């Protein structure tokens, strides 16, 4: 049986800019965030992780995506992750240019799809910036992070 890892992240968008983090290992751009601590709520986790990685305190983050990531080697499930993605449009503080996790940079919303990132992340970021409601998704990758399959289920909240 594999252990389910829980992570949170946040897409901070102000005007037409989004703050992203470039991970050093593959050079991929991601929404800042990280692993939840034992007993921590998803909201507390995203606020803490965002501050740790960026120096910024996000104000009133809203949950907009719940995702399952399955890493498979053949028919064997190597690991499973649950990711809770939030959006925010206001914050206090100023971002650092670099943290232990990588380099931080504001990007124009229209340039996001041209950045190097995990194959499924473009779909997630696009919905976070432009979609309405809550997005559920499942992504299956190889251990080398080749995307095997994905499914997205937007849920429009009335």
UniProtKB/Swiss-Prot annotation:
Task: Map motif Nudix box onto the chain.
Answer: 34-55
Phenotype on disruption: Cells lacking this gene have an unchanged spontaneous mutation frequency, even in triple mutT/yjhB/yvcI disruptions.
Alphabetical keyword list: Hydrolase, Magnesium, Metal-binding
Which cofactors, by name? Mg(2+)
| Gene3D superfamilies membership | Nucleoside Triphosphate Pyrophosphohydrolase
EC number(s) of the enzyme?
Answer: 3.6.-.-
* A matching Pfam family: NUDIX
Highest taxon, organism lineage: Bacteria
Q: Which family does it belong to?
A: Belongs to the Nudix hydrolase family.
**What is this protein's name?**
Uncharacterized Nudix hydrolase YvcI
Q: Which gene encodes it?
A: yvcI
């Amino acid at each position: 049986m594999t252990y389910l890892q829980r992570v949170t992240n946040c897409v901070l968008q102000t005007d037409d800019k989004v703050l992203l983090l470039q991970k050093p290992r593959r050079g991929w751009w991601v929404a800042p965030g990280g692993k939840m601590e034992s007993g921590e709520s998803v909201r507390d986790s995203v606020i803490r992780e965002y501050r740790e990685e960026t120096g910024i305190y996000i104000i009133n983050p809203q949950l907009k995506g719940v995702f399952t990531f399955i890493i498979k080697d053949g028919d064997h499930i190597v690991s499973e992750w649950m990711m809770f993605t939030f959006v925010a449009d206001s914050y206090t503080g100023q971002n650092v240019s670099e943290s232990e996790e990588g380099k931080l940079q504001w990007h124009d919303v229209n340039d996001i799809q041209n950045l190097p990132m995990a194959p499924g992340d473009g779909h997630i970021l696009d919905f976070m910036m432009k979609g309405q409601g809550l997005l559920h998704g499942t992504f299956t990758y190889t251990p080398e992070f080749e995307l095997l399959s994905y499914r997205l289920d937007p849920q429009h909240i009335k």
